[in-house]
Each structure stands twice: as structure tokens, then as C-alpha cells.
Amino acid sequence: NTSPKKSDCIVVAGGDGFMLNILKRFYMIKKPFYGINCGTFGFLMNKFTFTDIERKISKAKKTLINPLELIAIDKNNKRKKLIAINEVSLFRESKQTALIRLKVGKKIIMKKLIGDGVLISTPAGSTAYNLSVHGPILSLNSGKLAITPISPFRPRRWKGKIISNNMRVKINNLDTLKRPIAAVADNMEVRNVKSLIIKINKNIKLVLLHDRDRSLVKKIKIEQLRKNIK
């Protein structure tokens, strides 16, 4: 029963979505976060219990996460800055497919991508929406990001790209008038986007605490094994 600033640790009771909201709301006070799963899946959380919490927190394994930083410019040239722990997704807003250009660093890796959209995932988010659209699972310490197309129409067989997390990704909407697109940073949306710049913000360090038998590293390895078995 104390304020987040005066606490040693922030205990979050809820699901993954609630945890993402709390991380974004309180990351600037630089406290570790211990999640208790009261939701459905709870990938970022620990097993539901309210007994022996202090002991579990003291013995918990720390995981350091750097989020993505998104700068979106809409068709009216308004800028919006957001962070994403899992992924930044780009979606078509209408019946028309999205028509976008992808640039990594100084190199254009895709002059024209036609499809429902594209997403850029962190290792922590690579087992979430990224995996559902057949993206790769990334190890937490890989130092990589995944660029994964969403229902690509042209080029139909493009599976995406794994890049260094030191690289900056720029995405341009090539037809803002007929093919509007929206950008989503985890669960925060910007509509009518003209261009995006996405990069890892290494100045923001999020510390998640997990019980040693359910660490984030172990959970990701389990998902990798499941994917390989399939």
C-alpha cells in the first residue's frame, strides 16, 4: 500500500494486455515489474497466487527488455511518438490492400509490398502476433528484430526479414489517398499514417521479474520447441 515511486517493485495482477499498459505507464520510474496472471494466457505473467509474494519476488529472475520506439506521421503531418513492448503493426484501414515501402537503415528492402500490412516484432513479442502470422521466434538475447508481412499479395512468397536491433526501420505509405493504413504499437493506434520510423530505444530499460521455473527465456524456448515439432 504505497505509491509506485516509493515501492521496491510494482506487482501487476491481470493479463498480458494490462501488463503492457502498466509497463508503458510506469516505466519512467525505473522499478521492476512482477506480474500475477489473472487473465487468459499470461505469457508475461507468473502463475496466479497471492501467497509468499515477497519471497517469490526476492528470488525471481530478472529479464531486461528494451521497447520499440515508434514515430508516426499522419496525412496531416501530425507526429505521434509511442513505445511498443511486443510489436508495431501496420494494417490497411479499408477494403483496399496496403501499398507500402520498407527501408532498413539506408537500404530499401522492399520497394512495393502489397498486402494487409506488416509488423516489426521484438524478441519478447515474437511468440505473440508475430508467430500467428508465421514470423520467426527470436531468442531474448538475439539482438534481433523480426519484420513479418501480414497476408502478403505481392510479392506473395516474401516471408519477411530478421534484422539487427541496431537498425532503424522506415515505412512509407505509397498511396495515402486510396489505401489508408493504421499503425498499432501493442494496443495504441494511429490512423491515416503517411510514414513510420521504428527503432529500439535502448535508453528505456524494462525489468520483468519471473519465477525461476517460468522465466521469459524458458517460455520462449518452449514455444520454439512447439513450433519445431509442428
Residue spans of the language-model regions?
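Glycine-rich phosphate/dinucleotide-binding loop and adjoining beta-alpha-beta core of small-molecule
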Residues: D16-G35, L44-K47
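Short glycine-rich anion-binding loops that position phosphate/pyrophosphate groups of nucleotides
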Residues: G15-F18, G39-F41, A124-T127
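A glycine- and small-aliphatic-rich helix-loop capping segment at beta-alpha/alpha-beta transitions
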Residues: F26-K31, T49-I53, H134-G143
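Catalytic core of DAGKc-family lipid kinases
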Residues: T40-G117
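Short acidic low-complexity segments
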Residues: N1-D8
